[in-house]
Every structure is written in C-alpha cells, then in structure tokens.
Amino acid sequence: MYLLPLTLFLTAAFGVSIPRSPLIPGAQIVPASSTADLRAIGAQHHKYPDRETVTIRASRNALDDVSSDFLWGLKQANHGGRLLLKQGETYVIGKKLDLTFLDNIEVQLEGEIQFTNNITYWQANNFYYDFQKSITFWRWGGQDIKIFGSGVLNGNGQKWYDEFAGKQILVYNTFYRPILFLTDNATRISVEGITQLNSPCWTNFFVRTNDVSFDNVYIHAFSTNASSDPANTDGMDSLDVDGVSFTNMRIDVGDDCFSPKPNTTNIFVQNMWCNNTHGVSMGSIGQYAGEMDIIENVYIENVTLLNGQNGARLKAWAGQDVGYGRINNVTYKNIQIQNTDAPIVLDQCYFDINATECAKYPSAVNITNILFENIWGSSSGKDGKIVADLVCSPDAVCTNITLSNVNLTSPKGTAEIVCDDIQGGIGVDCVSDESVTR
C-alpha cells in the first residue's frame, strides 16, 4: 500500500498548512482557507483576497532585533503567501537584509517596522551604491511584490539628523546615512496605505526597477531638535527605472518631494500634496562625466506645493567633468503653488557652482517639450518678483518650453518671468535674467 508523505496526508485530509521549514518561536502560519483564523489575527483586507499568512513575533523592546525572524517570514510567505506584521506591534530591524529573492508576495504592514539607530553599525553594514554615495538598510527585489496596510515604516532618524548637522551630502559626503526603502532589480512592486517616517536620508530609492506604484502613502520627516533639521530626506527618487505611478500621496520632508534621477522614463503623478519640500523636480541629471542621462515621458497633475524652496523644477549639472543627456516630454498640469521661493525653475547650473564656472562649463543636457499648464498661487518673495526662472544653457537645446495659463503672484510686486536661451519663446512675455533684480 502506498502511503502519502505526512505533509501531503495532513494537507489533504485536514486542510492543515505545513510550513516549508520548521516554525520559529512566536511564528504562525494560517492557511488561506481558515477564514475565521485570518480574521482573528487581522490578516484580512478588503482589497486583497485571503492568502496563506505568516506571522512572526514582535520585538519586546527597542533593542530586540527581529531581523532574522523577518527574513524567515518573507521566505515562508514567498511564492504566493503573505507576511502579516500585526497592528499595535513593533518589529525592530537591526541588521542589513538582502531581500532581492522575492516573488509573488504580499507584506501586510499594520504595525510598525523600526530600524535601530546604531550609526556605527549601519555605516559599516549596509548596501552601497556609487550614485551619490548612497547606502541603505535593506534592498527589496524580485517580482510581484505588494506592501500594504495602515502601519508605519520608521527610519528612526533623529539621531542621524543630530549627527549629520553641519555636514554635506554632495559632493564630498563621508557621513553615509541609510535610505529607508530601496528596490533593486524589482518588477511590479506596489506600496499602498502605509506611513514612511523619519528616514535618515532619502525615503525611497528605486534602482533598476520596472513598474513601481505608490498609492495613498504618507511620507514625513521631522526633527525634535531645532538645531538639526532632517536633510536630504527626499520623498521619492529613482535611477534606471521605467514605469512609475505615484497617486494620492502626502509628503512633508524638507527636501525634494519627488525627484527622478537619471534614466527614469514613463512617469505618472496624480494627486500629490507636498509641504516644506524642494518641489517636484526632474533630476538632477548630467552629474557624471561621459554618461548620458535621460528623463522622459512624464505627466504630473493635481499637485499642491506649499511652503517650499521650489515648486515645479528641472535641474541639470554644469561644470568640468560632467555628463550630458535630455529631459524631454514633461507636463506639469493643474499645480497649486503657495508661499514657495521659486515656483517654476529651470536650473542648468546645478550643483554648488558659481555663475562664472557655469558660464565657462555650461550644461550639456537638452530640455525639450516641457509644458507648464494651469499653474497658480504665490511665491514667498525670497527671489524678488520672479515667479518663473527659466535660464537654459547656451550649449544645450532648449525648445518647445511652454507656459500656459500660469497665474503666479509675488508679495514683492508685479510678477516677473525670466527666460534666457530658449528657442522659439515660451508662450508668455518674459525678460532676460540680466534685467531683473533679485
């Protein structure tokens, strides 16, 4: 007589789900068919069908590192399951994690993931990226990855803000700070509903990733120390990415709200609220010598930009030993901008370069087919009467840059729009940079 293996027998006879490796202390695996049990642990979600769900133990205190449990849970839930991080619980991550093996997995974050603030450890143990000397606690990769829930991903950034005060990230950064969430070689990754809090550096960085979507995510970086504000805590950044969708976002970070970096294409942004940011920026690109960078096919609509340094911005590097490329086919539509230093900006003298050096070594990034449509609000007056500052590089092609129905005011007087070295006009009256007082 043929006997089924015990795991198959139990599954067939009793519907019991058998873990792929032995359970670790505090863990649980609930079959998708156990509706009542899933409901009891908080694993059901109105938008997503039930799946086999894995839970792990929560941290007992701020020093109780559950990194190995978290990694185990992801491996158990991989290939069709779900990892649940329970509401009201905190899961402390104190070791770097390579999560680039994921395939068809859901992470339901209802509690809080919190990283330790051991600066010495993280600066010695991280994943390093040459681009702007970036590091991260962990990296996510694979395909068909969904992260959703009402929980918090907490970078525990206050100690990093305090230690970093007075230092500079570009170009001479030596004080590396981790990125809160990084994807690398990922395809079809979505994040929905969660809060991302107090990243030490950029909040999100997508690298070599296709089809990334964020919806209804709140990103916030704040300091409890008035002398050490968060720095370089961009909301969203990308490098070598095709296919981006950011919808219904609230971002309050003190740096770029959204800033696609080199070779990001096919971007859709809708219903984004940005407070205290450096704006929705295309770039910077053209930083590295001999490299061609592209940002192309971008549609941004229904965005509110409040109390920021910049509003709608395009930025490209100038100077010796920089690169080249293009920013092409970008639409900013239905944008409200209030109390912002520079509401509309084309900056081709980026980064930290004086006017003499920029004139000697101008940017080689072409800016083409840019539309600013239905833009209204006010500047802060910090740049005088200027509400739009579009100064193109004499060594670049700048054409088909259009302002349509732009109604921006300045508290310093009649609003001025600056434009230089743009071929064919911009659709409205503008003056040369040399004729204005800043």
Swiss-Prot record:
One of its GO terms (biological process) is cell wall organization. GO terms for molecular function: galacturan 1,4-alpha-galacturonidase activity; polygalacturonase activity. Gene3D superfamilies: Single-stranded right-handed beta-helix, Pectin lyase-like (2.160.20.10). Glycans are attached at residues 118, 185, 225, 263, 275, 302, 329, 354, 366, 400, 407. It is found in: Secreted. Its main location: secreted. PbH1 repeats lie at residues 209-248, 295-316, 327-348, 398-430. Disulfide bonds join 257-274, 392-398. Pfam families: Glyco_hydro_28. The keyword Glycosyltransferase does not apply. InterPro entries: Glyco_hydro_28, Pectin_lyas_fold, Pectin_lyase_fold/virulence. It catalyses: [(1->4)-alpha-D-galacturonosyl](n) + H2O = alpha-D-galacturonate + [(1->4)-alpha-D-galacturonosyl](n-1). The keyword GTP-binding does not apply. GO terms for cellular component: extracellular region. Residues 1-15 form the signal peptide. The active site is at 255 (proton donor), 278. Keywords: Cell wall biogenesis/degradation, Disulfide bond, Glycoprotein, Glycosidase, Hydrolase, Repeat, Secreted, Signal. Its EC number is 3.2.1.67. Specific in hydrolyzing the terminal glycosidic bond of polygalacturonic acid and oligogalacturonates. Belongs to the glycosyl hydrolase 28 family. This is Probable exopolygalacturonase B. The gene is pgxB.
